[in-house]
């Protein structure tokens, strides 16, 4: 159990124990705190007592905006749903089985953080508190009478490539699909538990905070995402600047890009007991000034790129007790420092553990790496600077190619001498 471990400060900070609150009864009087704007095509909920789709339906009485399609709680939403600051909204099994959000486009965004002239699909925009429990939420294309499909993509390319964005992507725009976005100013949590979240998000070309990835947290500290099936989104999960979240016991698969992507200053997050597979890029990637992240006891396989990646100044974080197999790279550490990688089992990768782009002060120990087709442990040094002062010990490298020193490889060898402890076990 986590409470029994003796951890360094940054590991202890990352381990959080939380429980979700049970669903509460619907708000008996909501007509004054639910409004519809015909220009932005937005339902705004400002009720401070817990409110649900039934309350919205009773207040608006307009099936062109929100229609209940079956007695057991299948709803079709043709509007933005905006949860105001201080408001509390629940989408749960009290009155909902499946919320289908139309893939039609709103006239403009209702969110101040998005250009008001932008034409974007309907979405859920959270400035208050949202609870999603034991339901299904998807896009829905009323023309095809099926889930909305998008075909956009972004491809990482070397800096300076013609047509690339400033941060090195070639962008192929996708057909717009609805998404869920928790805003920077959210006054409460957005907890998602025991639900299916699918077929949301698209490639909008934005490198900032449009939130079109599918499931996006720019606020909502202390939120929990637990026990869900998250699939066929553009990004399975994306966050920026949030803290104290727990992502656990989810199955995350078939997302067009990353599976789980804590980003840009996300910190004090726990990612544990998830199954992450068959995503279009890394299974779990933490990138750009993320810290105090604990990634443990996850199973990752068949992702298009690495199972786990520490990227662009991720620091004081841990990946431990993960089972990773059939990936190009098991674990990549890139431009990241002072992390711990231990007790992971990596099978059938091309590269087991791969250190690139000036990563220093990392400790990699007690990992089992089996059947690497190229290198068990690979340490590269490039023009930006070397990988220095990393510590490797008690790693087991089993059945890696014999022509590269039983799976250990460094470029150049002088850098490798400073990183490798002689207690690695080679077979």
Predicted region positions:
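Sec-dependent signal peptide cleavage junction
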Residues: 3-16
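Beta-strand/loop edge motif enriched in small/polar residues
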Residues: 15-296, 301-325, 329, 335, ...
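Short, contiguous acidic/charged loop-to-helix segments that flank catalytic cores in large enzymes
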Residues: 355-356, 380-382
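Active-site-proximal flexible loops/turns
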Residues: 373, 401
